[in-house]
């Protein structure tokens, strides 16, 4: 099975280990990975900031880059959601709306692809300790992926998963929201860190690097002892 990887900006610039783990897990599951070097940003930051025309240019480029893929997989619920929003963005342009729908229909978040397409629930990972899961807003509320991460983590050998209190609450990242509304964002991420600490977990695990960078940065500044990991890193662990 051929999988075309959309690596995302944050993985490319800050968390390359997540990209590596994503590839290694998928290859271990029998996938052949393709990586189009022409890929750029999905356009979400510009679109959410109101720069619609600039965002559309990036989106058109991404549609052209990925439309011939068999499956498109990304280690980000947020960016996968943006791909699924493309048809709505181009709803008044039939030509691009059709091409956008073609891309959206074969785009999957990493864990969603493993569980729903590959029909795998145990990837053979092992990681001793206690974990709690942060469920990102776009991934759960817009993409509708709520169960796949927990299903996969429940089968990681040695790992105990505890529910995160107030799991439905945003971590305060929200892309440019954390920059434009910093005091509010800081309060939100403080509450998220407090919730994570309540669980007594060794690891806070999520599927979006934006959230994890935000939460992890706050944990570091507060001097808390809990390790933040992307789920691809966990599923690639053989501890």
From Swiss-Prot:
GO terms for biological process: lactate metabolic process. Pfam families: CCG. It comes from the Bacteria. InterPro entries: Cys_rich_dom, LutA. GO terms for molecular function: oxidoreductase activity. One of its GO terms (cellular component) is cytosol. Is involved in L-lactate degradation and allows cells to grow with lactate as the sole carbon source. Belongs to the LutA/YkgE family. HAMAP family: LutA. This is Lactate utilization protein A 1. It comes from Bacillus anthracis. The lineage of its organism: Bacteria, Bacillati, Bacillota, Bacilli, Bacillales.
């Amino acid at each position: 099975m051929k999988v075309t990887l959309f690596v995302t900006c944050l993985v490319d610039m800050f968390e390359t280990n997540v990209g590596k783990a994503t590839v290694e897990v998928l290859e271990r599951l029998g996938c052949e990975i393709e990586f189009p070097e022409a890929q750029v940003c999905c356009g979400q930051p510009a679109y959410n900031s109101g720069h619609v025309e600039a965002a559309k240019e990036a989106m058109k480029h991404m549609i052209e880059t990925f439309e011939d893929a068999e499956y498109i997989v990304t280690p980000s619920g947020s960016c996968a959601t943006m791909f699924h929003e493309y048809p709505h963005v181009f709803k008044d342009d039939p030509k691009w709306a059709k091409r956008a729908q073609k891309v959206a229909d074969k785009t999957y978040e990493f864990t969603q692809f493993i569980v729903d397409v590959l029909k795998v629930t145990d990837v053979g990972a092992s990681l001793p300790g206690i974990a709690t899961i942060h469920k990102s807003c776009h991934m759960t509320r817009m993409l509708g992926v709520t169960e796949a991460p927990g299903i996969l983590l429940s089968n990681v050998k040695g790992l105990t998963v505890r529910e995160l209190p107030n799991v439905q609450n945003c971590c305060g990242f929200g892309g440019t929201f954390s920059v434009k509304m910093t005091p509010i964002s800081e309060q939100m991420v403080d509450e998220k860190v407090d919730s994570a600490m309540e669980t007594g977990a060794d690891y806070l695990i999520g599927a979006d690097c934006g959230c994890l960078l935000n939460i992890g940065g706050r944990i570091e500044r507060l001097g808390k002892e809990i390790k933040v990991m992307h789920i691809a890193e966990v599923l690639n662990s053989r501890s």
